[in-house]
Amino acid sequence: MKHWWWKILAVVLVLGASIAALRVPLKQALVHVSPDRIAPGPVALEVTGYNTRFGKDEQAWLENDGQKVCAASVIVVNEHLVRMTVDVPAGLRSNMTDVCVGRSRLNGALYTEGLGSGIAEEHECGIGGKYVDFSFTFPNRNILYETIRNLCFHVPMWFSMMVLFGISLVASIRALGSTDLRHDMAADLSVRVGLLFCVMGLITGSLWARATWGAWWTNDVKLNGAAVSALIYLAYLVLRGSVPEPSKRARLAAIYNIFAFVLLVLFIWILPRLNAVDSLHPGNGGNPAFGSYDLDNSLRVVFYPACLGWILIGVWMYTLRLRLARLQSQLDDANPS
């Protein structure tokens, strides 16, 4: 049983994180405001919410650089739609104005015209209406919305792949310093399992791109780097199949594998983070990484166990394949043809 604890932990973490990632609701949020520009004078706005429960006495207002402008009238069409009219004063200080309805806010929802040094008279707008307080919710972010759940599936695939390719790198280095072909076997099998996670990462990434960016594949440096890395490791398998002599194959494959890992780090971790390179991925090409804004504490509670669980699953798959390969090798040695 002492050798099974981490395998049981892997299953529990993956199942628990997967169920939580799919079942935990998103926070209530404002997701759309129409129109998206305002100028001094009366303006009618239509505000759409998600997971909201707007009540008949709902309060609404605009906020610009800390100054509030209360809505003249608020009509609650339903729990997720509010129509409000606002007499926009001249002299707002910032180009972007937030829209607030009850306890929900959409930052930078309105482009503001007619800027000045600030409004002379400011009113305090009360907060009313029915409030749904989910005890455990995921952040509700523009563009991502429900697809933010995929973070707990997509990113763990890449972490698992990196760990497995790292195991392969260590095995290849050991293979160069030894004549023991078991190191070469370990490098080969860890690459094969790592490629499985690479493919799953590409699939989940493509699905996510379709839902958020509107295309199955975009000319994104990280997407292209991941695809090139997959081809590099597929070429590793082709190289192994083209060299029949075991010891020569082990040395050539080990040298190739070391360079492959260097290129993997370059394409996935270094190039996308250069400011001169445009990338849609968070944390790349000047885009902000998942931090306190996107990856809040509730999402971390699910995200980190998911990463650890999938890494352990990947290592488990690798050890199973390695044991089977060693048993097959022993049988072949005992029964030479």
Predicted regions and their residues:
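Beta-strand/beta-sandwich contexts
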Residues: 16-57, 111-134
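Membrane-interface transmembrane-helix boundary segments in multi-pass integral membrane proteins
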Residues: 273-315, 333-337
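Membrane-interface helix-loop-helix modules in multi-pass inner-membrane proteins
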Residues: 195-241
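Hydrophobic cores of alpha-helical transmembrane segments in multi-pass inner/ER membrane proteins
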Residues: 158-171, 228-240, 301-319
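Hydrophobic alpha-helical membrane-insertion segments
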Residues: 13-21, 255-271
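N-terminal membrane topogenic signal
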Residues: 1-11
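Immunoglobulin-like IPT/TIG beta-sandwich domains and homologous Ig-like subdomains
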Residues: 33-109
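Early transmembrane hairpin module of multi-pass membrane proteins
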Residues: 133-173, 177-183
